[in-house]
A protein has these predicted regions:
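Transmembrane-helix bundle of Major Facilitator Superfamily
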Residues: 2-186
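Membrane-interface helix termini and inter-helical loops of multi-pass transporters
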Residues: 40-41, 216-227, 256-259
Length: 290
């Protein structure tokens, strides 16, 4: 560790965090190019294919806040390594053992859980190992790697399907994840919160419930209809859970998500822009690959 608190191998660590982040982001999109082959091989209909794609996003998005908070409390390196192991194991299981759409959906859900451990841990580790004066540049590089993960995923997925089969889309994850695991074990330092703040189990439950119901409604609405009773009920539940989550986080001393962040216009507008761009990009890719 240098005098200013910076880790002497921080740029190597940033490279490892970037690689880990790319693994998370490319798994959002690699499968899209394999959907036609999977539809034939697994006899999957459009609803099955949508769940194969979205089970990853549902668990990933629903568990992201909780896994980030647990990683900060119990150890960011542990969270990173555990998440990569889950991603690699689920990828191998899908490649070698999945023979139905349900098998792939379960594997993708497990991958989403692993990704929810990895992504927040990578950012937290970057923040810890870089001094304040270099932190903005490091986070900018981290953000850039998140952005290029999707196009890399399309290229990798296209190559795998063109030259092999849809199973290779999963199998290709394994050596990349092994590389990230080994490099992480060697170079990434252990870190966690210095001050043991109380856990927020109620906030964790409400965040998972709110994000899960929102994502479920968005996933199922195209097939069930936006005005169907089920979607309206789930949408209403999502609003209630979101309201309860926000009010709970406002009222406790150590919130899992400080609501005050949303008062900053740049933060809020940036989130809205990312959300809209993601909706457009992933909707386009899903419909065009079928």
């Amino acid at each position: 560790m240098e005098e200013n608190g910076a880790h002497e191998k921080r740029w190597i660590i940033l490279g490892i965090m970037s690689l880990s982040l790319v693994i998370v982001m490319l798994n959002n999109v690699t499968l899209n190019v394999a959907l036609p082959e999977m539809s034939k091989d697994l006899k999957a209909d459009n609803s099955d294919l949508q769940w194969i794609v979205d089970s990853y996003a549902l668990i990933f998005g629903g568990m992201l806040l909780v896994m980030g908070a647990l990683g900060d409390r119990f150890g960011r390196k542990k969270a990173l390594q555990l998440g990569l192991v889950l991603l690699g194991t689920a990828s191998a299981a899908a490649a070698f053992y999945a023979d139905s759409s349900n098998d792939v959906i379960i594997a993708r859900a497990a991958m989403g859980f692993g990704a929810a451990l990895v992504m927040p841990a990578t950012l937290s580790i970057v923040i810890v190992v870089f001094p304040r004066e270099e932190r903005g540049k490091a986070i900018g590089i981290w953000t850039m790697m998140a952005g290029i993960g999707a196009p890399i995923g399309l290229l990798v997925g296209g190559w795998a399907v063109e030259n092999y089969d849809w199973q290779m889309v999963f199998l290709i994850n394994v050596p990349i994840i092994l590389l990230a695991l080994i490099l992480g074990l060697v170079f990434v330092p252990n870190s966690k919160e210095d001050k043991r703040t109380p856990l927020d189990p109620i906030g964790a439950f409400l965040s998972v419930a709110a994000l899960g119901t929102i994502l479920y409604a968005i996933i199922e609405a195209p097939s069930l209809g936006w005005t169907s009773p089920e979607i309206l009920a789930i949408g209403a539940l999502a609003i209630v859970m979101s309201y309860l989550f926000v009010n709970w986080e406002k009222g406790i001393e150590y919130p899992m998500l400080p609501i005050g962040f949303f008062k900053f216009k740049g933060f809020s507008l940036g989130l809205i822009a990312i959300m809209l761009a993601s909706f457009v990009m992933f909707s386009f890719m899903f419909t065009q690959m079928l």
